[in-house]
Every structure is written in C-alpha cells, then in structure tokens.
Regions:
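Paired acidic/hydrophobic, glycine-rich loop segments that form the ligand-binding mouth/hinge
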Residues: 1-2, 158-163, 179
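A ligand-binding cleft/hinge motif common to bilobed small-molecule-binding domains
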Residues: 6-12, 164-177
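Short helices/loops that flank or line small-molecule/ion binding pockets
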Residues: 9-10, 14, 64, 78-82, ...
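Extracytoplasmic/periplasmic substrate-recognition and gating elements
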Residues: 172-235
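Hinge/lid segment of periplasmic solute-binding proteins
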Residues: 3-56, 68, 179-183
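C-terminal capping/gating helix-and-loop segments adjacent to ligand/active sites or protein-protein/ligand interfaces
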Residues: 198, 236-239, 255-310
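Glycine-centered hinge/linker elements that transmit conformational signals in sensory
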Residues: 115-145
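Extracytoplasmic/periplasmic solute-binding protein
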Residues: 46-56, 74-118, 157-159
Length: 311
C-alpha cells in the first residue's frame, strides 16, 4: 500500500510496516537521499520511494538573472536590485522559513517517541535568523505567498521560491525566459551555506500482516524501480525519487521537476508536528515587519511554543 511520508511514524508505531530487508543497499543507492530519509525511521528503512515531488525550489526570469546569479542569494538580490526587480519568498510561512535553519545544520524532526525536536534557538539557528533578517531588510526582497509570485513573476518579480503546482502559471508568464533551479546558497556567518528544504514523498510499504513478505517485497521493488518510475512520470507527470530517472532527458526537459530533483539532495522529510507552524509563521512575519531587535529571544519563544504544543 502507498502512504505519504509524514505518516511513517504513525504506521511504524502501529506495527503496520514491514522492514525492507531485500536489496536494501540497492534501493538506497537508486533513490535520492531525501526520499530514502523519508522512508526511514529510527535508522530502519520501512518502504520503497515512489515519488519525490512535493517540495520547493527557485523559479527565475532568465532575461534578468544568469545561471551564475542564481547560485547565491546575494547574486539574486544584487541582480534584482540592479534591474529594479524583486526576489519573492514567503518568509512568514514555516515551510519555507525552515530552509535557512535546515541549511545551517539545525534540526526539526521527531525523536524515537514521536516528540518534536527543534533546536532553532542554538548558535547555528541564531546565525540563520540573522541571514533571514538581512534578507527581509534588503530593498530587492518582496515577501508574500504563491499568488503574488505566480501573478507578478516576469513583471515586478524576477525570482521566487515555490513548488511544482504553480509551474504552468509561471511558464505561461515567463515564456521563453522561464527557468528553474535548486535553491541558492546564502551568506551565513560569513560563509556560503546551501539552503535546505522539506521534501514530501509517496512511499510503497509492505503490510506486516502479509503471509508472503518476500513476494510482497519483490512486487514493491518492481513497482518503484527505475522503469516503473519513468513510466509513471511519462503517463502522470509524477516527480521521480529514482536518481537515474531524475537525471534523465525526459525529466530534464521539465525545468520545475529537474530543479526539484537537484534540490532533493539538500532536503529532509517533513517530520513536523502541528505545534511548529504558527510560531514559525509569527517569527517570519516579525522579520518581514523589521521587528528583529532581539533574535535570540524570538528564537527561544519559537522553540518553546513549538515544543510546548505537544504536551
């Protein structure tokens, strides 16, 4: 049976998933690190990645930005300012906000008991917060969600972060200037750090109640192998977790999926409880409003509220 990766802990605790024991190393090698992470809990692989297409990356207008510009956030902002354009990101949304913290090595995950771990208020988190504040204070930055991005890219906006679900609208707006790539690096503590992200995957699991686990594993492996994922992409447009399919000419011809595949190397599964989203959004909104005079206190509050919500 298939399941979204954010259900893995519930299924494991219900003893519903059979551990992958056949061709485990091969399956790990054939799929992206982010997808394998999504199918793994407490060091055990519990499923076969099928897709890896629920995530985010950078859309950009290549009449304004070069391939070199989009490698770094500094490059994007400098080129945007020079052209009188804006870079857009929904900083007041915890899903996107986390990219800075995750990129700088912070943790937002669950422990073995299913409790939320969030260390955004440590030294690395503070450095990431300072980078977010610098972004929000930059004249070429424009905060806002996906409606703003897909409506204004090609006009006031030259680049923005979102997912595949707006690719058709962005492509229509930009035409021949349509481009996409992985997220950029950002300046953090005087160094360039790659932005992280969340990646959502569909996973095929083997039911522990099966009387034929070997045959079930063989079937699951077949249904998620390279050829099956390629056919699924060609017929349905699903983004592959298989590294060979992700690197194929077929996927490369779809800039959004190619960008998502490139970003997946820096993505983690969304093991996040509901208590994170509201305080994270509030933290981002404060920085957008230029209210970041005591970042450490703000981070302490974010983490306290995130963890307290589960008690």
């Amino acid at each position: 049976f298939s399941y979204p990766d954010d259900q893995i802990i519930t299924l494991v605790k219900a003893d519903a998933l059979y551990e992958v024991t056949r061709n485990r190393d091969q399956i790990i090698a054939e799929n992206s690190a982010g997808a394998i992470n999504a199918a793994t809990y407490d060091g055990v692989l519990y499923g076969y990645p099928m897709t890896a297409d629920n995530g985010y990356f950078l859309y950009y207008d290549k009449s304004v930005l070069t391939e070199e510009d989009v490698q770094t956030l500094d490059g994007i902002l400098a080129a945007a300012e020079k052209a009188g354009k804006k870079f857009n990101m929904d900083v007041a949304n915890g899903w996107y906000l986390a990219s800075f913290f995750l990129g700088n090595g912070c943790q937002l995950t669950l422990d073995a008991d299913g409790k939320q771990i969030c260390d955004f208020n440590n030294e690395k988190g503070l450095a990431a917060a300072e980078a977010i504040k610098a972004l929000c204070d930059h004249p070429a930055f424009l905060a806002g969600g996906q409606d703003l991005l897909q409506g204004s890219i090609g006009d006031t906006i030259c680049a923005g972060i979102c997912g595949t679900w707006i690719s058709s609208a962005v492509k229509e707006k930009l035409g021949d200037n349509y481009a996409a790539c992985k997220l950029p690096t950002f300046t953090c503590g005087g160094e360039q750090v790659q932005m992280g992200s969340f990646l959502g995957c569909k996973i095929l699991g083997v039911n522990t109640q099966t009387a034929h686990p070997v045959e079930a594993m063989e079937l699951a492996e077949y249904l998620t192998n390279e050829q099956s994922q390629l056919r699924r992409f060609e017929a349905l447009g699903y983004g592959p977790s298989n590294v060979n399919v992700a690197a194929s000419e077929a996927v490369a011809s779809e800039p959004a999926l190619a960008a998502l595949a490139a970003q997946s190397a820096y993505a983690i599964s969304q093991h996040v409880l509901g208590g994170y989203w509201t305080p994270a959004g509030a933290f981002g909104a404060e920085l957008v409003a230029h209210n970041g005079s005591d970042l450490q206190a703000m981070l302490d509050q974010l983490v306290e509220q995130t963890v307290a919500a589960q008690n």
